[in-house]
Amino acid sequence: MENTYCTQLEYIADYLKQTSFYIYAGPAARIRAYSVPKDYFTCKSIQHFKPYLTPNLPKRFHYANNIRIDKVHLLVDQQWLAVRDNRYTACNGGNHGYDNEFKSMQAIFLGYGPGFKEKTEVDPFENIEVYNLMCDLLHITPAPNNGTHGSLNHLLKNPFYNPSHAKEESSPSSCPVVNLSPPSELGCTCNEMLDVSEINKRLNLTETNSRNLPYGRPRVLQKENTYCVLSHHGYVSGYSYNIWMPLWTAYTVNNQENTSSLPPTVSDCLRADVRIPVAQSQNCSDYPEGLNFTRGFLYPPNFNSSGLEQYDALLTSNIVPMYPAFGVLWDYFHNVLLQKYSRERNGINVISGPVFDYNYDVQGNNPSFTPLNCSGSLEVLSFILPHRPDNTESCAVSPSEWVEKRVQAHVARVRDVELLTGLDFYQERQEPVSEILQLKTFLPTFETDIN
């Protein structure tokens, strides 16, 4: 529960003066209206809610794909309520239904009996995991459900169920360097590059997995997904022949004592990857001027210090379509936030890739994930960032004022990422599968305590 006060109310009628609407008032307000105003209402001063259209809600809510779900949702600040107007009176006291990122929304689980460990305190877990736990205590097989069976084995003296890793449905093929000169330039140019053949020799690697994939290659759980593993000096990617872009890209960012800004990316340079057949490659001509989207790099080329090393990432196999507005967030996240996280954690490993969720049911419809970790006990942060043509979710002009808040608003469980991408992570990590599942189902919080 959370304290609420009649002095802390947002009157939505003040925002929708010309619109007929019905509001389900409270800490998780929903609005039903015949027409949704184009004004996003995020930039009024001292505003205590964040509005979302249903498709743009954070994926961790699993709340979007149903005809009964309203069009507009208000994520309200702690201890505030969103109501229609000043006639609302049921406001003093307490309430629940706020964002489950808030610690005040967490319940207390007490387990007592012969099956439970004694005097044991564990990290928070979600309610959807309790059903499997109850079935294990009764020694019965649970019906299909949204929980991750085995993720609460650490609560039990003698776990009834022993989980195993998911079976990989599509294994990677090889993408060798057959010719040092590309059969087609794919409409790409790179004016500053001198010797194409010498630079392409750098792509003739067998693997760099031990550094960039310390916990193993992500397994693909979707059938008939044709892809190959591309190794580079600075990163590894799983390139899909089905979608003509990487399923995932992995790299390690070391803790740098030098805190100066990263070098700029080599300008006006993108080149064909000689390892990928022309028929399965994106073309630079796919991105002419005048479109509302451009191309972005999954692995930032400027993470390499020299121009020679940057050419390893200035490849058509490293690009994804990207709205320019999203590129502002993407660049700041990599150039500033990842460097910050690397210093705080003494180095991080990153996996990122595209998500396709056209009907926003939080299940992958086709083949942003960023785990951060340190040595010893693994720590993970996962984010599923909505790829939108504008940044109206945030108001501040400077990226330093809004990007990290936006990223944190879209934090997710690793399990959410797996459901969306059809990938399975950490299969080569040397620890029991139940402990890996515990890691995958944990939802980090960034809450600031309120007195």
Model-derived regions: residue spans:
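Acidic/polar loop patches that form or flank catalytic/metal-binding clefts of enzymes
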Residues: D39-P55, A82-V83, T141-G147, L329-N335, ...
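Polar, surface-exposed loop/tail segments
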Residues: H48-I69, T141-S173
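Active-site neighborhoods of enzymes that stabilize oxyanions during catalysis
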Residues: Q18-T120, F125-L133
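Domain-level detector for secreted/extracellular nuclease and nuclease-toxin modules, and
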Residues: L133, S151-L152, N158, P163-N451
